[in-house]
């Protein structure tokens, strides 16, 4: 039977190495960190091992069927073996495809929590109003996933919101929300438009993985930390306590601020998480600048023509331009029903990875 023998050989080697890792767990004097790393690797490889065992079984059954076809003179056995072989040949390509997907490199940040920042771009007041709509959309989506949302900073505008930063904690958060980074364009009639004309506005979204202290080293001497009075809604904390925190990373000039926590300690902790995420983004951008396929930064310039997604209210249509996906249910998407779009983006990511893997 024809099957991808090189694929079989490669996975067989991986399975052997995984079995060795299982044996290593029984070694004495392993540190907690070593055990943690091994268990993480075993968990990651488990789906591949399951599929490989399925492939092994198919190959064994195919070999048995071929032996019967070549050696048996009994017509009944011959027909049964022929049917079995046809069944195996039909199921083999999809199984090999699944295994190839499982061999693809996994983004090490997929399991991480995130920090999301949304800013208005082109469109004035309408951009600030749309920013507020997107913020509510993400909050609803996070609720549907049983994720928690923690507000870091919010700056109100005369209408809508001028800036918002929030953390999202849960399972596989970056794996899903990372696709939201970029320019989001809205086409609709603003509430302030007397003549009923459709306006186009944009906001930028940045999704950054939250990194642990061990992943990003920050020298305390590189930081300037300022405290100030938080300006909560309705005058909360105003002129009462300097609980808000602003941190400046002197080597890069990156500034982060947090005032939504109840204490200076809480705000400082959140601000440090934001800073680690910003430094990661800064390092990523430097790395990208050295590559041949240099692309623009995560959110781009915010120009109307530079967009990842368009929200067309008059036609109840939402289009993701990266994968040319159009669905006519903007009314539910804007309330947080993002699954169809995000799942399509994840599938496209896997497809592109597989094409690179094969080539």
Curated annotation (Swiss-Prot):
Record's keyword terms, sorted: Cytoplasm, Methylation, Protein biosynthesis
Gene3D superfamilies to which the protein is assigned, alphabetical: 3.30.160.20, 3.30.70.1660, 6.10.140.1950
Modified residues (N5-methylglutamine): 236
This protein's GO CC annotations: cytoplasm
Function recorded in the entry: Peptide chain release factor 1 directs the termination of translation in response to the peptide chain termination codons UAG and UAA.
Residue pairs linked by disulfide bridges in the UniProt entry: none
Recorded family membership: Belongs to the prokaryotic/mitochondrial release factor family.
One Pfam family recorded for the sequence: RF-1
Compartments where located: Cytoplasm
GO molecular function, one term: translation release factor activity, codon specific
Protein name: Peptide chain release factor 1
PROSITE patterns: RF_PROK_I
Gene assigned in the entry: prfA
Modification note: Methylated by PrmC. Methylation increases the termination efficiency of RF1.
InterPro entries registered for this protein in UniProt: PCRF (IPR005139), Pep_chain_release_fac_I (IPR000352), Pep_chain_release_fac_I_sf (IPR045853), Prokaryotic/Mito_RF (IPR050057), RF-1 (IPR004373)
């Amino acid at each position: 039977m024809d099957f991808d023998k090189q694929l079989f050989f490669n996975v067989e080697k991986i399975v052997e190495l995984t079995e060795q890792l299982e044996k290593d767990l029984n070694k004495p004097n392993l540190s907690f960190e070593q055990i943690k790393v091994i268990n993480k690797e075993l968990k990651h490889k488990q789906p591949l091992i399951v599929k490989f065992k399925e492939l092994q079984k198919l190959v064994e059954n195919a070999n048995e069927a071929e032996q019967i076809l070549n050696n048996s003179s009994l017509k009944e056995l011959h027909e049964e073996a022929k049917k079995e072989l046809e069944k195996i040949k039909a199921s083999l390509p999809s199984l090999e495809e699944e295994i190839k997907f499982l061999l693809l490199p996994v983004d090490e940040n997929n399991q991480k929590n995130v920090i999301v920042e949304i800013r208005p771009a082109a469109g004035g007041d309408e951009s600030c109003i749309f920013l507020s709509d997107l913020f509510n959309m993400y909050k609803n989506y996070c609720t549907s996933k049983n994720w928690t949302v923690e507000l870091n900073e919010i700056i109100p505008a005369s209408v809508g919101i001028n800036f918002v930063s929030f953390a999202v904690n849960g399972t596989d958060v970056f794996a899903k929300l990372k696709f939201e980074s970029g320019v989001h364009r809205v086409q609709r009639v603003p509430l302030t438009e007397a003549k009923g004309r459709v306006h186009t506005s944009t906001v930028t979204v940045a999704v950054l993985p939250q990194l642990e202290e061990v992943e990003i080293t920050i020298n305390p001497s590189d930081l300037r930390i300022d405290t100030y009075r938080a300006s909560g809604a309705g005058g909360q904390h105003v002129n009462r306590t300097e609980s808000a925190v602003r941190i400046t990373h002197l080597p890069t000039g990156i500034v982060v601020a947090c005032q939504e926590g109840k204490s200076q300690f809480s705000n400082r902790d959140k601000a440090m998480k934001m800073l680690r995420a910003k430094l990661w983004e800064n390092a990523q951008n430097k790395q990208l600048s050295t590559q041949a396929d240099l692309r623009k930064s995560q959110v781009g310039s915010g120009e109307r023509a530079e967009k990842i997604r368009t929200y067309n209210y008059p036609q109840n249509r939402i289009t993701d331009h990266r994968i040319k996906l159009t669905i006519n249910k903007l009314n539910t998407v804007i309330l947080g029903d993002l699954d169809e779009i995000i799942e399509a983006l994840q599938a496209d990511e896997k497809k592109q990875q597989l094409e690179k893997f094969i080539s």
